[in-house]
Structure formats: C-alpha cells, structure tokens
UniProtKB/Swiss-Prot annotation:
Pfam families: OTCace, OTCace_N. It is an enzyme of class 2 (transferase). Reversibly catalyzes the transfer of the carbamoyl group from carbamoyl phosphate (CP) to the N(epsilon) atom of ornithine (ORN) to produce L-citrulline. L-ornithine binds at N170, D233, S237, M238. Keywords: Amino-acid biosynthesis, Arginine biosynthesis, Cytoplasm, Transferase. Pathway: Amino-acid biosynthesis; L-arginine biosynthesis; L-arginine from L-ornithine and carbamoyl phosphate: step 1/3. It catalyses: carbamoyl phosphate + L-ornithine = L-citrulline + phosphate + H(+). GO terms for biological process: arginine biosynthetic process via ornithine; citrulline biosynthetic process; L-arginine biosynthetic process. Belongs to the aspartate/ornithine carbamoyltransferase superfamily. OTCase family. GO terms for molecular function: amino acid binding; ornithine carbamoyltransferase activity. GO terms for cellular component: cytoplasm. It is found in: Cytoplasm. This is Ornithine carbamoyltransferase. It comes from Corynebacterium efficiens (strain DSM 44549 / YS-314 / AJ 12310 / JCM 11189 / NBRC 100395). The gene is argF.
Length: 318
C-alpha cells in the first residue's frame, strides 16, 4: 500500500479530472514562460532512474528540472544497487532523505508501488510495461493547442481520439485511462489477440463514467470515422523484439496512412509518441504530412512534465 501522506503520479487515474486540467493549464503557462515557476524555495534535487533506455524521457526531464531551478541525479540500473538485494521499500525510504522527488522509468508497475510504500517524496511514473502517463499529459497538451486553444482542457470533452495498432501495450492502456479522464471519447482499434486487457478497459470506463466519455475497443476500421485525433505506436514495444510473436502481419491493415486519415474528420491531427517506423505503423506521407503534430507532441513532454512536478510538489498533503 502506498504511503497515504504522499501524492504520487504512478498511473493516469492518480489525477482527478479537475487535477489533470490544472496540470494541463500549468503546462501551457510554462510553455509560454519556461521560467514562470519555482516549486520550492529550498533545493530541488530529483532522482531520475532508468531501468529502460530513453531519449525523450531523459532529455525532457533533465531539461525541465533545470528550468525549475533544480538538479537531476540520473542513475541507470547498471550503476546502483536497486534490485540487487536491497528492497525497493528501503530504497524509497533512503532516496527520500536525499531528494525532493523521484522519477522512474522501469519495467513492472509493482516496482513503483513497492517503492511508494515508504517514499516520503512524490514518485513519477516515467514509463512501465503497463502505463506511460507522462506521455498522455503531453499528448493532451498538444490536443488542447490544436483543438481547444480558447477553451483549454475543458474543450476536450466530447472530442474523439482513435488509436490503431497494438492495443495490448502501455500506450493503449494510458490513452484509455488518461483520455477518459479528460472527457474524451477514446477508441482502441486493434486486431483480435492484441486488444487491451480487461482490467485496463474497466479502469478507463470507471473514469469515463465520471466525465461522460466513452471507451470503445474494436477491430473495425470504420471506428475511425469522426475522429479528431488519430494515434498509433510502434508495433514492437521495447522488450518484445524476441518474444516469438508475429507483430507485423496482424497489424498491416491498421497502418495509419492517407486512406485511414481520410476516414477521420477533415481537420484531424496525427500523434505518435516516437520513435516511429515509417512504412510500418505509419506511412511517411502521414507522419511527415500536414496533419502530423509529432514534434510538438515530443516538445510538450518537457512542458507537461515540468507542470506535473510543480503540481505534485505544491499539492502534497499536510
């Protein structure tokens, strides 16, 4: 059980709909004025831990923490004792004596919850096998910029997003939960055998009941109709390269190409968390075309994560 006296961001539904909107509003402010916020009067040191390699996560957190006047202490799994005898509970207790926050990109979601049992500083999920909630905040910021610049996060309600490809991965899970939190209708369009696990569908639908959103899982490409946002991800997620499963043939009909985009709304935008493989999950004509917002999306990792850290540090209990 996580420490009830600390607010963490381990999953998309750790923020209420109102809290998510606060983070997105702050992210927009920090994008306009990168030095607008300093969350602490004293020192700000953040442990940034990597069990999985990264480009965007590493650079965006390092730069963002520096913008906030802090210092990132970056440690990979090969240069610490984590997972080599010392319990994660002990590690969480010890790191909390040194830093003001912990950011961790790891494998099992349980790693985060184990550390959160004893950590007395906020922990941020920078990606697990189950979820990638920081990416969803960046995506939502990008959608607000393009589809609701005047209304802000409130204008996301009723917008429709569709995700095509591998529905049984961390991105699909977080899209369902995070977008439902924002009040967006979200459809996962994936072949049989590659659809989301029911536990994540249920979590997303529970949140959708609060916000009036819908969560749809289907293998039918007709579901693209009416989409304001079209999304995909790599067909072979990190760590699945040698699992013996054919991760190409089943997904070929679900490539996001010009024909798929033509089914969506005329002004629909395209998102991809990157890295992308042109000619596989997305055609070059789409990702390099006028609907693509993938580089704005990547930039917004910086702003959304800064906003999240500020919000967590300013909204701890007590």
């Amino acid at each position: 059980m996580t420490n009830p006296n600390v607010r963490h961001f381990l999953a998309d539904d750790d923020l209420t709909p109102a809290e998510q909107a606060e983070v997105l509003t702050l992210a927009a402010e920090l994008k306009r004025n990168p030095l607008a916020k300093r969350p602490l009067e004293g020192p700000l040191s953040v442990a940034v831990l990597f069990d999985k390699t990264s480009t965007r996560t590493r650079f965006s957190f390092d730069a963002g923490i520096a913008h906030l006047g802090g210092h990132a202490i970056v440690v990979d799994s090969g240069s610490s004792q984590m997972g080599k005898g010392e319990t994660l509970q002990d590690t969480g207790a010890v790191l909390s004596r040194y830093v003001e926050a912990i950011v961790w990109r790891t494998y099992a979601q349980s790693n985060l919850t184990d550390m959160a049992e004893t950590a007395t500083v906020p922990i941020v999920n920078a990606l697990t096998d189950d979820l990638h909630p920081c990416q969803i905040l960046a995506d939502l910021q990008t959608i607000v910029e393009n589809l609701s610049p005047e209304q802000g996060p409130a204008g996301l309600k009723g917008k429709k997003a569709v995700y095509l490809g591998d529905g049984d991965n961390n991105m699909a899970n977080s899209y369902m939960i995070g977008f439902a939190t924002a009040g967006m209708d979200i459809s996962i369009i994936a072949p049989s055998g590659f659809q989301p696990k029911q536990v994540f569908v249920d979590r997303a639908r529970a949140r959708a009941q609060e916000t009036g959103a819908t969560v749809t899982v289907t293998d039918n490409l007709d579901e693209v109709a009416g989409a304001d946002v079209v999304i995909t991800d790599t067909w072979v997620s990190m760590g699945m390269e040698n699992d013996g499963i054919d991760r190409t043939t089943p997904f070929v009909p679900y490539q996001v190409n010009d024909e798929v985009m033509a089914r969506a709304n005329e002004d629909a935008i395209f998102l991809h968390c990157l890295p992308a493989y042109r000619g596989s999950e997305v055609s070059a004509s789409v990702i390099d075309g006028p609907a693509s917002r993938v580089f704005d999306e990547a930039e917004n990792r910086l702003h959304a994560q800064k906003a999240l850290l500020v919000w967590l540090l300013e909204n701890q209990p007590g």
